[in-house]
Amino acid sequence: MKSDELRLTPGARRILEVASQLFYRDGIHAVGVDTIAAESGVTKRTLYDRFGSKDALVAAYLRRRHELWWQQFEQRIAVAESPRALVVFDAYLDDATMVSRGCAFVNAAAELPRDHAAYSAIREHKQAVRDRLAELVAEDRPDPGEARRLAEHVFLLVEGAIVHRGLDDSTQPMDTARDIARDLLDTEPIAT
């Protein structure tokens, strides 16, 4: 999932920055292109020239959000101790500490129909997290099936904690889910 941000003009970058803040803070459906254009200091025509449609702008927002989060995630992985899969909780907790409206991808999934042009960015983000967790769990689990199963458990724990974090602005669910994941990952591998 790569964005075209490097090829964006300064005006397009500003539009994307403003739209990202508004979509996350107020919700995708609550924010119109008039508001985005006005707060970006551009005309609607410029917005449409740069992105083509609000749907394409939403997709760009989600791709950008993924890249920023992924960068933070990989930085944490690089310095983590075993089991490194637990850093997923820290990465989401860091993100949630900076913002308190929950997961941008879960929020977008709640607003967008599955056939929306931007929905694939949601699926790609969640699948990338799931796949990376499987790689990290496999570092400590030689059996690929067991590693995949445990990674799925960790993924579901973190997803549930993310949703709960967005509901009540508490870190407790994330801490509890992390403890459960540690218990799962600290158990002896199942003999095959």
What are these regions (language model features)?
Residues 1-26, 30-39, 56:
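Basic, helix-initiating cap at the start of DNA-binding domains
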Residues 13, 17, 45, 103:
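Short alpha-helical elements of helix-turn-helix
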Residues 25-28, 41, 48-64:
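HTH DNA-binding helix-turn interface
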Residues 60, 71-101, 146, 150-154:
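Hydrophobic alpha-helical connector segments
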Residues 67-70, 74-76, 83-86, 115-141, ...:
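Amphipathic alpha-helical packing segments from all-alpha helical-bundle domains
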Residues 97-119:
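Amphipathic alpha-helical segments used for helix-helix packing
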Residues 118-123, 140-192:
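Hydrophobic/aromatic-rich alpha-helical bundle segments in the mid-to-C-terminal region
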